[in-house]
A protein has these predicted regions:
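Glycine-rich, aromatic-bearing surface loops/beta-hairpins
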Residues: 87-90, 100-144
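Long, continuous compositionally biased terminal/linker segments
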Residues: 17, 39-96
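Intrinsic disorder
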Residues: 10-13, 85
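Short beta-strand
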Residues: 33-36
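A short, surface-exposed helix-loop junction/capping segment
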Residues: 1-7
Length: 144
């Protein structure tokens, strides 16, 4: 089965604009787009929480998406496996995920910081997930 949005023709900048609109409508106070060689490589934003302002960096790994497209192309030559297409697909998937999360937020089942907790950045720009992965933070055992 091919990955979601593998046929998208929507320009990355249009998708980034849609993401920015979703985030700003739901409380983002600042949004920054990162680029490398003219390609969007990251999107960070700030939200206000009960503990103060928090920075969040969304995950995007176009190289990994490209590898998935290349692997899937072996079984389906209709799949376009270029870096440009992988970048479009990656950001479209992120946009769809954010859109779904904002729908859950609107039902008041969750708070913004719950949705983006793994992507909250520390003062060095490292996300909570990255710190966890490097064993810099551990969850306490509840059996103690």
């Amino acid at each position: 089965m091919a990955i979601k949005n593998y046929t998208t023709t929507i320009n990355v900048n249009k998708t980034i604009g849609e993401i920015q609109e979703l985030l700003s409508k739901h409380g983002a106070t600042a949004i920054m787009t990162e680029y490398s060689n003219g390609n969007v490589t990251g999107l960070s934003f700030k939200i206000m929480t009960s503990k103060g302002e928090v920075g969040i960096r969304l995950p995007s790994n176009t190289d990994r998406v490209l590898q998935v497209l290349k692997n899937q192309r072996k079984n389906n030559n209709q799949i376009k496996d270029t870096f440009d297409q992988a970048n479009k697909v990656a950001w479209r998937i992120i946009k769809d995920w954010i859109d779904a999360q904002m729908a859950i937020l609107e039902t008041e089942m969750v708070e913004m910081e719950q949705i983006f907790l793994p992507y909250v950045m520390n003062n060095k720009g490292q996300t909570l997930y990255e710190s966890f992965k490097e064993n810099r933070i551990l969850l306490e055992d509840s059996n103690d």
